[in-house]
């Protein structure tokens, strides 16, 4: 009976399309690629780790037909609101990432502009807490950009 219940739960979750977060089935055309990134090292390593986790292989030679080029991430911090004393009460982080997916043999070049936005409060009594929160929000913003890029790669129409 217990085995039947486990089998039923597994069938139900797979039939409804549920899957673990971060797992993206990428098309075969992007399973072997080279990665050229001008983004910061932390972002590049997390992106590479996510790609490897989803089955992408990075050959040591130049044999890959697909090249993924990542421009530097541009993150801008804006004051969103101020308190009654004229001090910043909330900040907004806006991120933009330019990505190019090039298929060398076919000569196709696809460019994407990915963006993200985060809002966080400014604790005027604790500068360290605000700096810590900004750091966390920047990391989450980068994670959002990686997820968006993985979704774009999933839907990439390459030959």
Tell where the protein language model's regions lie, with residue ranges:
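N-terminal segment of the mature soluble domain
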Residues: 29-74
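Sec/Tat-exported extracytoplasmic proteins
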Residues: 51, 55, 101, 105, ...
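Solvent-exposed, acidic/flexible segments
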Residues: 40, 44, 90-94, 134-142, ...
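C-terminal motif of bacterial Sec signal peptides marking the signal peptidase cleavage site
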Residues: 12-15
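Surface-exposed short loop/turn segments
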Residues: 54, 69-113, 118-131, 135
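C-terminal/domain-edge helix-coil "capping" segments
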Residues: 128-159
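Positively charged n-region of N-terminal signal peptides that target proteins for export
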Residues: 1-5
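Bacterial signal peptide processing site
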Residues: 17-20
């Amino acid at each position: 009976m217990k085995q039947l219940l486990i089998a039923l739960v597994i069938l139900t979750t797979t039939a409804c399309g549920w899957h673990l977060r971060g797992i993206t089935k990428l098309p075969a055309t992007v399973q072997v690629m080279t990665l050229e990134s001008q983004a910061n090292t932390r972002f590049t390593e997390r992106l590479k780790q996510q790609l490897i986790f989803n089955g992408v292989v990075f050959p040591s030679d130049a044999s890959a037909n697909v090249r993924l080029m990542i421009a530097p991430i541009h993150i801008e911090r804006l004051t969103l609101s101020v308190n009654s004393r004229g001090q910043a009460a909330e900040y907004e982080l806006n991120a933009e990432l330019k990505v190019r997916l090039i298929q060398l043999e076919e000569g196709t070049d696809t460019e994407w502009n990915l963006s993200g936005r985060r809002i966080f409060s400014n604790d005027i009594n604790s500068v360290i807490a605000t700096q810590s929160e900004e750091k966390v929000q920047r990391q989450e913003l980068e994670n959002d950009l990686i997820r968006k890029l993985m979704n774009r790669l999933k839907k990439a129409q390459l030959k």
